[in-house]
Each structure stands twice: as structure tokens, then as C-alpha cells.
């Protein structure tokens, strides 16, 4: 396997090329990319957890250090001012020496406000990308060059196409997340609470709650009906029926985003439905290829949902085509089939059709779909179908012409289990689709 250092060297070359093109298109001399700053809680001296600017960590795997700056022009070696204060109150990260530091000029920055004296004197044609526009103004950056939309759209569009370095990092993140999912299932089987299952997950992945790329969804029984449930009960339920875990990991700034659902018992209708959703998810992935719209796969899965609703007699006396046409599948899968994945969990440019930022919205019928792109080699996406029994979505169907087709008795029997979601992370290649999750044997 090619070393991470070698892959990173090629990664930087790709970013340099993209930067040259962006600077030429928008007539800028360089980009000043800010890692970000700590922000205090209102009326307090305690900061919120630091989250790095994703455009910064695209260049360097520095994710925990505020007040860092990158100057890139697409030609010269990227210059990183790394914040290195003298501070006995807080931990100070040492000046990095790692696989990537040969390709970046790393300079210590002892004072957060000292960057102004280190930048080129002429800054009128430098673009700033970062979360603190007022800092850019203080440095003399032109207001029109602060987070310029055209530049950001251009960079976002090409972030969709992962370099081999990025894919290597994402495969490592998968390994960590898979370890966490296995530990969490074991904790569930042993009767632990959501809170304790989450601790087991974090321990297995080597993450803290502030390190994971998104808040873990650890949902037992009815809690799986809340799509982004993050409460974490401290007490285990009296009866364990089901467990939905949506949890990821991060490696060098790149995310994994996996979901699995387990039934406490293996011989009930819910367990069979979990198996069937899993089988249909794998069958859909087997059909995926470059050159097809991601929207098509979302539409295809609604056909598969209809098949399962009919098979399990949740909807009766109606064709699968009619179910989809009249959106009877909608309340059972109210979210999109997935989303782009990378430096961010819901990665950027899901709706961009070109490097000018042309936007193609999700279909009106499925507004929560997060991607309308034509699949191309290098893209990484999640495939995460589900079936849920959510009363607020089912309630409107209890009246009206279609109510008679809903097997309400069956639905009531399944509601205590609440929901099913199965999520893998896939890479689009020229002639195949790589399932990073299943390659690690996560069932």
C-alpha cells in the first residue's frame, strides 16, 4: 500500500492545481485560510468546543488548534502559521512533525494577534476563507474578498472528488467506526442504557463526545422514531426491543457515518423487517454506477420500500406503483437516501451541477434529499434507507381515501420498535462501487 506521506504529496499537488485555477478565475493572488477561533459561551469565560474550518483541514490534518493560518497561492509551498503560545493554563499542541510536514512550511505563531506582521504587506488581492470576517478586515483584507462565493463554490464543487489520500483517511475512519458499532451492539445485548452504550462506543473508537463528527444517535425502542435522537437515557428500558445506532468517527479530519439497527429477538416480524431492509439496501448499492443521478437511487428505493410494505402486509390491496405514486411510502421513509461524505458529514456541493455553483434542488416530493448530483468517480456518499413508524407522520393517513390500505393493527404492533435504518459509506469508481463499510465485514 502506498504510504500516507506519498498520498498526501499527491493530494497537495491536486489542491495546488485547484487553487491556481480558482485564483486565475477570480483574479486573486492568494488565499488566506483561517483554522478558526474559540468562542466563549454567552456571559461566561468558558469556550464552546473548537470546530475547525473544513477548508483548512482540507490542506492539513490539524483539527484541534485555533488561531492557525494557511497562505496558499497554488505555486509556492503552502505556508502554515501554527499557533504555539506560551500557556500554563491550557494544553499547547507541539509544532507538528509528521508525514505531511515536508510538503508544508510550518512556522510557529506565538501570539494569536501576531499574524498581521507576518503576512505579505500587500493584501488587497488576497482572499480570506474562514469563520471570523472581522479578523480579516482587521488584517486589511478587502470586504469583497472575504469568503468570496465564487471561490468557495469552486472549491466546494471539487471537494466532491476525493484524492487517494482522502480515501485512505476515510477508510481509516471506517475502521474506527466499525469497532465502535461492534462494541455498541455488545453493550446493547448485555442490557446497557443508551448512556452506557455511548460510552462503550466512544471507548472503542478512541473518541470523546466532542471528537466524533456528529452527535451519536443511540436509540433504544421508541426513541428510534426520532431521526436525530441524541438524548441518551441513563436508565435501560425494562424491555429491550430494538436498537438503532447512527454513529461515526473521524481520522485526519475525514468522517465516517454508519448506521445499524438490531432487534433484541431474532424471531419476530421486526427482526425480519430489519433483515429485509438490509437486503434491499445491499441490492440497491449493487446497481449503483457512475453516470447516474443520485436522485434516481432515491426514487428506486421508494419502490423497494413499497415492496417491503406489501411483503409485510403493512400496506394492503394496493400495487407497489400506486403506493409510490400516491406517496404512501413517504411517511415510512421521510428522509433522503443519503448524502455526500468527506471533511463534513453532510459534505458540501450535494446540489451543485458545475464549478460555478449551479444549484439543482431536491425534487419537491422529496425535499429532504441532500444530493442531486450525477455520480462520478471519486465521489463518496452514504446509502442509508430506512423504515419508521412515526405517529406524527402516520396520523394524517388515518383519515381519507387511503386509510383503508394501512394495516393499522400491524403498524401499532411495530411502533414500539419504532424505526430501522441501515447506512453504508460507498466510493464511486469508474467501473465499480466500493462499499467501505461492508469491506470491513460489518453486517
UniProtKB/Swiss-Prot annotation:
One Pfam entry name: Peptidase_M24
Superkingdom assignment: Bacteria
Cofactor note: Binds 2 manganese ions per subunit.
Binding-site list for Mn(2+) 1: 257, 339, 384, 423
Entry keywords, A to Z: Dipeptidase, Hydrolase, Manganese, Metal-binding, Metalloprotease, Protease
Assigned protein family: Belongs to the peptidase M24B family. Bacterial-type prolidase subfamily.
Protein name per UniProt: Xaa-Pro dipeptidase
Organism listed in the record: Shigella boydii serotype 18 (strain CDC 3083-94 / BS512)
Amino acid at each position: 500500500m502506498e504510504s500516507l506521506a506519498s498520498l498526501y504529496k499527491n493530494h497537495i499537488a491536486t489542491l495546488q492545481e485547484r487553487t491556481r485555477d480558482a485564483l486565475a478565475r477570480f483574479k486573486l493572488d492568494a488565499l488566506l485560510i483561517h483554522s478558526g477561533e474559540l468562542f466563549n459561551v454567552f456571559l461566561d469565560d468558558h469556550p464552546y468546543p473548537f470546530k475547525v474550518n473544513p477548508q483548512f483541514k482540507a490542506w492539513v490534518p490539524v483539527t484541534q488548534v485555533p488561531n492557525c493560518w494557511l497562505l496558499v497561492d497554488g505555486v509556492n509551498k503552502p505556508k502554515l502559521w501554527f499557533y504555539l503560545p506560551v500557556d500554563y493554563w491550557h494544553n499547547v499542541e507541539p509544532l507538528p512533525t509528521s508525514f505531511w510536514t515536508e510538503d508544508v512550511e510550518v512556522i510557529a505563531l506565538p501570539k494569536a494577534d501576531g499574524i498581521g506582521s507576518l503576512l505579505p504587506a500587500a493584501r488587497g488581492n488576497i482572499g480570506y476563507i474562514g469563520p471570523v470576517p472581522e479578523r480579516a478586515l482587521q488584517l486589511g483584507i478587502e470586504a469583497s474578498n472575504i469568503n468570496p462565493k465564487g471561490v468557495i463554490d469552486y472549491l466546494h464543487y471539487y471537494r466532491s472528488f476525493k484524492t487517494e489520500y482522502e480515501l485512505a483517511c476515510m477508510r481509516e475512519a471506517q475502521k474506527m467506526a466499525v469497532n465502535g458499532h461492534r462494541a455498541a451492539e455488545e453493550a446493547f445485548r448485555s442490557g446497557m442504557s443508551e448512556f452506557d452504550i455511548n460510552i462503550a462506543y466512544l471507548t472503542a473508537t478512541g473518541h470523546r463526545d466532542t471528537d466524533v463528527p456528529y452527535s451519536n444517535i443511540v436509540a433504544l425502542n421508541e426513541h428510534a422514531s426520532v431521526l436525530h435522537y441524541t438524548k441518551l437515557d441513563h436508565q435501560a428500558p425494562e424491555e429491550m426491543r430494538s436498537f438503532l445506532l447512527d454513529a461515526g468517527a473521524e481520522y485526519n479530519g475525514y468522517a465516517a457515518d454508519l448506521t445499524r439497527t438490531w432487534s433484541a429477538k431474532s424471531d419476530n416480524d421486526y427482526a425480519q423487517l430489519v433483515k429485509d431492509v438490509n437486503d434491499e439496501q445491499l441490492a440497491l448499492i449493487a446497481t449503483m454506477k457512475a453516470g447516474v443521478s443520485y436522485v434516481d437511487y432515491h426514487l428506486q428505493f421508494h419502490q423497494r420500500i413499497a415492496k417491503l410494505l406489501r411483503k409485510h402486509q403493512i400496506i394492503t390491496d394496493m400495487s407497489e406503483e400506486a403506493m409510490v405514486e400516491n406517496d404512501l411510502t413517504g411517511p415510512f421513509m421521510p428522509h433522503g437516501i443519503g448524502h455526500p461524505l468527506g471533511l463534513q458529514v453532510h459534505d458540501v456541493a450535494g446540489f451543485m451541477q458545475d464549478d460555478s455553483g449551479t444549484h439543482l434542488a431536491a425534487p419537491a416530493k422529496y425535499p429532504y434529499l441532500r444530493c442531486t448530483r450525477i455520480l462520478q468517480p471519486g465521489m463518496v456518499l452514504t446509502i442509508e434507507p430506512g423504515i419508521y413508524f412515526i405517529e406524527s407522520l402516520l396520523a394524517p393517513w388515518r383519515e381519507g381515501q387511503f386509510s383503508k390500505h394501512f394495516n393499522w393493527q400491524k403498524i401499532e404492533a411495530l411502533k414500539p420498535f419504532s424505526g430501522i435504518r441501515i447506512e453504508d459509506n460507498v466510493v464511486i469508481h469508474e467501473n465499480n462501487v466500493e462499499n467501505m463499510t461492508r469491506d470491513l465485514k460489518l453486517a
